[in-house]
Amino acid sequence: MDGVTRRQWMAALAVSPLAGAAAAYTTSSPRAEGSAGCGSPVRLPARERLRLGRLHNVPLTTHEGRRVRFYDDLVKDRKVAINFMYATCTGVCVPTTRHLVEAQKLLGGRVGRDIFFYSITLKPEADTPAVLAEYAARHGIGPGWQFLTGEPADIEKLRRGLGFASADPTEDADTSNHLGIVRLVVEPAARWGHTVALAPPAHIVRSMHFEFDSPTLRAVRTYVEG
């Protein structure tokens, strides 16, 4: 399994999409409420709940040195694949990056056109844009794939918002538990899924086709749809 331990593999599988947590963004959530008169709460559309609850618009810097906002510049109106990594990682990150490079090739010219890849560092203090640029070049990253760094507090907010967190503090403190999963989001349709990056690249691409392209998907996988 590319040198990845069973524990790491199971940890990756454990970071599943937060289907159950979707209920948190119902009328009982302050972020999901508005006023309809007489104190009655109004449930926001799924897309708005996803933006407010998960896709935090924090400032980031790409490996090319460009300053961006996560939601406004990278996610809004797009189909995106997001994972976490760090440049000195020698475990799960190695096969994850390799498999995503192969998946990018299998997707042909779609990456950078209608699908976008984002890899966010878990160690922003060390992973400067220059460090991430060297990492991207070393691994043969193609167009349409950005490596991102930023302030530690903003990275942490994204990590938790995107569902790469554990309720167990000990497990959550283990960086390896947040690697090996790719969050798949179709922002306009409020679709929210994932794939396992340690799976074969062809499986990753099939998962992306399912999440990104299925014409009937909205009825069964839309984020927080009641």
Regions found by a protein language model. Give the residues of each.
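Thiol-based oxidoreductase modules, predominantly thioredoxin-like and allied folds used
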Residues: 114-127, 144-153
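Short active-site neighborhood of thiol/selenol oxidoreductases, capturing the structured segment around
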Residues: 70-94, 100
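N-terminal secretory signal peptides and thylakoid transit peptides that target proteins
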Residues: 1-17
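Conserved helix-turn-beta segment immediately C-terminal to the redox Cys motif
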Residues: 97-118
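Short, internal strand/loop/helix patches
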Residues: 134-179
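N-terminal "domain-start" segment that seeds a small globular fold
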Residues: 37-72, 98-99
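Thiol-/selenol-based redox modules, centered on thioredoxin-like
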Residues: 172-226
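Short loop/turn microsegments at loop-to-beta-strand junctions
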Residues: 55-56, 80, 180
